[in-house]
């Protein structure tokens, strides 16, 4: 009760204090306290010094100061009086002038230069500027000479409660875990007040909650927000809106206030166990489904979110634990049941599983709420499907000897239809795996037989694929790999491992090893190779060489004596019989060539006679000489024939089947000849119509331009063409009517559109069958011979 009375009295006195501050009568204080009055002592004494300069000589300081105050935001009809300047040197004769300078002098503060009164002519705001520093000085009214040194003073702006609190960082967001205990700190907020925190209670703030109760509370002075209720459940309500108020003047009436909002979100904790939506699930699956296929999904719902809702799924019981598995889908938060092993409808038609869902992240604070897991039953029904045949073995390994008879049985494969309605099976070989068709199979019983002979030395293994097909449904097929190993038999005789050539020194010693040889066998006996070496029966008593078997299955050839002479015999041939240990044993004879060479004293071969080179075909030197002689003789005959052919005179008589157009005829033409198509053409000038290259056809007979004379009779067929041309040339040269060589001669123009076309051999590109020369008979007797020639060529061609 006393505290409430004190607050009431404070609320009543606050307006009175503000009014007392603003009264002008209190701004100017009485001279006894010298609050806002400046006074001076004795008058200014003036004295003269050298150079007639006057200086001020003050007996005592005349200014007395206190700070001046002015209330902010004051807006009256008249400028507010801040204070008054006064000096003791002012007797009231109005001969002293007061000057004010500094912050705001002349713009904010104005002084009466006679009375020294200072007024604020503008509205002041403490939040913009809290104090002003000015300089005061008293000068002579007439001379403006200072009577006292300048002095500084401060005018402070007194604060009033004109600013409301503000939340600069609002609105706010905060989180707090659900199920938190009472008084759990959520966050804290801060408001600011621009008023003076030192003077009065204008900046003293008190916080309160306007909205958000009874869930949250706030401490009035620190603004810390706490939970006001325990065990708030996120699943019931996840988000809360809290309205917070900050009020100045200590929260009393008349104070200014500001508000902000705080959004509080409850974060999730694992306080809920998973729960299956149903206790029994039914799924069906065909028996031929591929391993790893998803059969179905089960899901346990959890009201929590994030990692608190994550659950792991397991199969904990049932008769199909070996055939099925369950995996957790973290994205969908469910369990996926997949096939682990093949199913067989004929063996078992249904399975029962018991699955469990358990939270992964457990919060021990809520373990008392029970186990965070749940179980459900899954019923899986297997559906019948038409399955492909099943072989009795996934792979087959067969063995056969390489000398096995054709059509002999190598082995057998078996397969069955696993369905209830069993279908007969037919077998076949995938020929892509048996391109050479070395094997066959019985389509009914699956027996594999040999089709072509085998050779282990060519291929030891044969891998084929057998196909089993249902007769009732050809789309149901199965394949099985069959590996056939070819077993070895002794069918190859041993022989030298390489071609050997031994060298024997003439000065060699008896018992000296000439050469060491080894043998090889393409067969592969189980116990390895063991070779027997011997000489031919007729070479057993060989006087020159002997053999010795070594422990490493090789053979050494030794000399029996010394004194070999390459002049007497240069090469020795030693046949060696090599036998294997097979059943039956096989043998072969290999010949070792031994050359006698000249050697140094230390046994180094220096020279050996070279054996005459023998052609691979076995021809002797005499046969070679005979062959070369025959070739040279043939070449001589050919050269003689060509030479005689060149000197032979061939007749120039035109044969009946010869075409005269195939002969090149020379003309003595003016100008550039036939090739000169750009030369001067008098016929073109005489016929302007032919300028464009198209002349009208004129069928006229040639006119005689010379005196009549007796000519020779037409030349009969078969006459010599050379003689005929020479006669005609002689007549032309001796013709007195012929024009001179330097005159312009006019020839019959045969241009484009002429029936005859060009008579040049170079332009005769068409075949004889495409041309008709019957019109030549209409040109007169002088062209009769030409017509006969062409007519003869055409008739001969037809015959």
Swiss-Prot record:
InterPro entries, per database record: Cadherin, Cadherin-like_dom, Cadherin-like_sf, Cadherin_CS, Cadherin_Y-type_LIR, Catenin-bd_sf
List of residues that carry Phosphoserine: 795
Removed propeptide positions: 30-61
Domain Cadherin, residue spans: 62-167, 168-276, 277-391, 392-494, 495-616
Function: Cadherins are calcium-dependent cell adhesion proteins. They preferentially interact with themselves in a homophilic manner in connecting cells; cadherins may thus contribute to the sorting of heterogeneous cell types.
Domain notes: Three calcium ions are usually bound at the interface of each cadherin domain and rigidify the connections, imparting a strong curvature to the full-length ectodomain.
Cell location: Cell membrane
MF terms in GO: beta-catenin binding; cadherin binding; calcium ion binding; identical protein binding
Protein name: Cadherin-8
Transmembrane segments: 622-642
Main location class: membrane
S-S pairs: none
Membrane topology: Single-pass type I membrane protein
Glycosylation sites: 188, 463, 473, 544
GO biological process, one term: calcium-dependent cell-cell adhesion via plasma membrane cell adhesion molecules
Cytoplasmic side: 643-799
Keywords associated with the record: Calcium, Cell adhesion, Cell membrane, Cleavage on pair of basic residues, Glycoprotein, Membrane, Metal-binding, Phosphoprotein, Repeat, Signal, Transmembrane, Transmembrane helix
Keyword Membrane in annotation: yes
Signal peptide segment: 1-29
GO cellular component, one term: axon terminus
Ranges in the topological domain labelled Extracellular: 62-621
Gene source species: Rattus norvegicus
Gene name per UniProt: Cdh8
């Amino acid at each position: 009760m006393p505290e409430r009375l004190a607050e009431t009295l404070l609320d009543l006195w606050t307006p009175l204090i503000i009014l007392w501050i603003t009264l002008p009568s209190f701004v100017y204080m009485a001279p006894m306290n010298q609050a806002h009055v400046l006074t001076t002592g004795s008058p200014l004494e003036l004295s003269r010094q050298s150079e007639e300069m006057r200086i001020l000589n003050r007996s005592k300081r005349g200014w007395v100061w206190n700070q001046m105050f002015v209330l902010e935001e004051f807006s009256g009809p008249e400028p507010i009086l801040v204070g008054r300047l006064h000096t003791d040197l002012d007797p009231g004769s109005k001969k002293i002038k007061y000057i004010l300078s500094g912050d705001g002098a002349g713009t904010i503060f104005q002084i009466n230069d006679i009375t020294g009164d200072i007024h604020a002519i503008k509205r002041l705001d403490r939040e913009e500027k809290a104090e002003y520093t000015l300089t005061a000085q008293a000068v002579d009214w007439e001379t403006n000479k200072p009577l006292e040194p300048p002095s500084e003073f401060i005018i402070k702006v007194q604060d009033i409660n004109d600013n409301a609190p503000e939340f600069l960082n609002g609105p706010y967001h905060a989180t707090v875990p659900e199920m938190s205990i009472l008084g759990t700190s959520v966050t804290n907020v801060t408001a600011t007040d621009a008023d003076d925190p030192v003077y009065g209670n204008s900046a003293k703030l008190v916080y309160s909650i306007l909205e958000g109760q009874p869930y949250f509370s706030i401490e009035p002075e620190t603004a810390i927000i706490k939970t006001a209720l325990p065990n708030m459940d996120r699943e019931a309500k996840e988000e809360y809106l809290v309205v917070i108020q900050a009020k100045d003047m200590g929260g009393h009436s008349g104070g200014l206030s500001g508000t902000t909002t705080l959004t509080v979100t409850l974060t999730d904790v694992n306080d809920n166990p998973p729960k299956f939506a149903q206790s029994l699930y039914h799924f069906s699956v065909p028996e031929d489904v591929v391993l790893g296929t998803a059969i179905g999904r089960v899901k346990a719902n959890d009201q929590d979110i994030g990692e608190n809702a994550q659950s792991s799924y397991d199969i904990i019981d049932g008769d199909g634990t070996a055939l099925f598995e369950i995996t957790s889908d973290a994205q969908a938060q469910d369990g996926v049941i997949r096939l682990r092993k093949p199913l067989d409808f004929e063996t078992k038609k249904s399975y029962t599983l018991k699955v469990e869902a358990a939270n992964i992240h457990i919060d021990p604070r809520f373990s008392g709420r029970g186990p965070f897991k749940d179980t459900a039953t899954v019923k899986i029904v297997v559906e019948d499907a038409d399955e492909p045949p099943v072989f009795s073995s996934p792979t087959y390994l067969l063995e056969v000897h390489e000398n096995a008879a054709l059509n002999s049985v190598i082995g057998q494969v078996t397969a069955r239809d696993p369905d209830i309605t069993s279908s007969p099976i037919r077998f076949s070989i995938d020929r892509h795996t048996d391109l050479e068709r070395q094997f066959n199979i019985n389509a009914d019983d699956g027996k594999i037989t040999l089709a072509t002979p085998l050779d282990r030395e060519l291929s030891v293994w044969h891998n084929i694929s057998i196909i089993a097909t249902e007769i009732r449904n050809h789309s149901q097929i199965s394949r099985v790999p069959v590996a056939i190993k070819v077993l070895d038999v002794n069918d190859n005789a041993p022989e030298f491992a390489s071609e050997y050539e031994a060298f024997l020194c003439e000065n060699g010693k008896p018992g000296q090893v000439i050469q060491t040889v080894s043998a090889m066998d393409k067969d592969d006996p189980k116990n390895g190779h063991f070779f027997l070496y011997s000489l031919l029966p007729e070479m057993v008593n060989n006087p020159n060489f002997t053999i010795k078997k070594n422990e490493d299955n090789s053979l050494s050839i030794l000399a029996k004596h010394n004194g070999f002479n390459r002049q007497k015999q240069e090469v020795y041939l030693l046949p060696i019989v090599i036998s294997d240990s097979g059943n039956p044993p096989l043998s072969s004879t290999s010949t070792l060539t031994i050359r006698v060479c000249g050697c140094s004293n230390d046994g180094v071969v220096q020279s050996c006679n070279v054996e005459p080179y023998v052609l691979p075909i076995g021809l002797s030197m005499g046969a070679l000489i005979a062959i070369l002689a025959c070739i040279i003789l043939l070449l001589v005959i050919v050269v003689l024939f060509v030479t005689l052919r060149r000197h032979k005179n061939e007749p120039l008589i035109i044969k009946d089947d010869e075409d005269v157009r195939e002969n090149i005829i020379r003309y003595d033409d003016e100008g550039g000849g036939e090739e000169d198509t750009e030369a001067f053409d008098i016929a073109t000038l005489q016929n302007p119509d032919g300028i464009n290259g198209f002349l009208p056809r004129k069928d006229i007979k040639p006119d005689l331009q010379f005196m009549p004379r007796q000519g020779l009779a037409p030349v009969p067929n078969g006459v010599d063409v050379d003689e005929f041309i020479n006669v005609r040339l002689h007549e032309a040269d001796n013709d007195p009517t012929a024009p001179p060589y330097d005159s312009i001669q006019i020839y019959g123009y045969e241009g484009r559109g002429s029936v005859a076309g060009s008579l040049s051999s170079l332009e005769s590109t068409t075949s004889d069958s495409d041309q008709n020369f019957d019109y030549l008979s209409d040109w007169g007797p002088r062209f009769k011979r030409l017509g006969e020639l062409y007519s003869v060529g055409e008739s001969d061609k037809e015959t």
